[in-house]
Amino acid sequence: MNIYDVSQKAGVSIATVSRVINGNPNVSEKTKQKVLDVMKEIGYTPNVFARGLGLNTMKTIGIMCSDSSDTFLANAVYHLEQNLRKNGYDSFLCCTGYELHTKQKYLKLLLSKRVDAIVMVGSSFLEANKKDNAYIMEAADEVPIMLINGYLSHPRIYCTLCDDHQAVYDAVSKLITQGRKEILYLYNSKSYSGLQKLSGYKAALAAHELPLDENLMQMCPNNLADTKNLLNSLVKQGLNYDAVVTAEDLLAIGTIKFIKDSGRQIPQDVSIIGYNNSLLTTCCDPELTSIDNHVETLCISTISTLMRVLNGNDVPNKTTISNDLIVRKTTNF
């Protein structure tokens, strides 16, 4: 039995049940007693939701991150821990890798630690096969699940994400209006976020009536050596491009190195735009124009939503944050 069963049998919202459990005064005595009677009848014992009652709460949040060496994910974990600490919560961090079975294992581990909620950082936690996401939905029946940069429909899963589609659409459109017609797109993932970015690229070309060339959409591992090797093979194939947009800053850094080594000028011959606005953008020459997905804002919003959920408030299940293009030296905007 869980909080949803109590809600259904008592004929009240999940938020109302949560308020009763948390001792929130904004519930009538009649409703409160009805909820308590149902809880007793079905044998439901509050655990992590019972913050106000002090029942089994650990004041601890689980954080799941697929790869702590990824600059975006590492930065997100930092801001999450900072904001949780400000709100009086500790955190357990699990670096899960990308395999489904390890993600399932670590989620089960966090639930066994009786954490108050779980934050999943990055859309790599969403699988293409929807059945493989069932373990996340099952966990959401026990604790609130916060998902950063991905979307999964469930009443107890709360998603905070950037508008990746619009961000890439705007960046590509800006290049096109500057006269760039052969825009190479490099990406390293087919995650929810990765597919949103790719769809933004395609939509921008369509909106400006440019042909969609499959050769100009290349998947590439997120490291310098593989980026260089891929670009070198494209040159040998005779592929021409006058701009490059990448799904990650590191792919753009590899592109900068390759273009410079080939004797072409940036941005005169080739304009380059990265994604994430990471520290890497100012550690290269020329400095990289990049899309800022506001990771700190994402994390602050996520924790703010989480605190409201734990306090029994009604909150939206999806919050979208807009991105900004930070112009530096790899474009001539």
Swiss-Prot record:
Its main location: cytoplasm. One of its GO terms (cellular component) is cytoplasm. PROSITE patterns: HTH_LACI_2 (PS50932). The keyword Transcription applies. Residues 3-22 bind DNA. One of its GO terms (molecular function) is DNA-binding transcription factor activity. It is found in: Cytoplasm. Keywords: Cytoplasm, DNA-binding, Transcription, Transcription regulation. Induction: Up-regulated on galacturonic acid. Transmembrane segments: none annotated. InterPro entries: HTH_LacI, Lambda_DNA-bd_dom_sf, Peripla_BP/Lac1_sug-bd_dom, Peripla_BP_I. Residues 1-55 form the HTH lacI-type domain. Involved in control of pectin and galacturonic acid metabolism. Probably represses a comprehensive set of pectin fermentation genes by binding a conserved palindrome at or downstream of their transcription start site to block transcription. In the presence of galacturonic acid may activate transcription of acetate synthesis and other aspects of carbon metabolism. This is HTH-type transcriptional regulator Cphy_2742. It comes from Lachnoclostridium phytofermentans (strain ATCC 700394 / DSM 18823 / ISDg). The lineage of its organism: Bacteria, Bacillati, Bacillota, Clostridia, Lachnospirales.
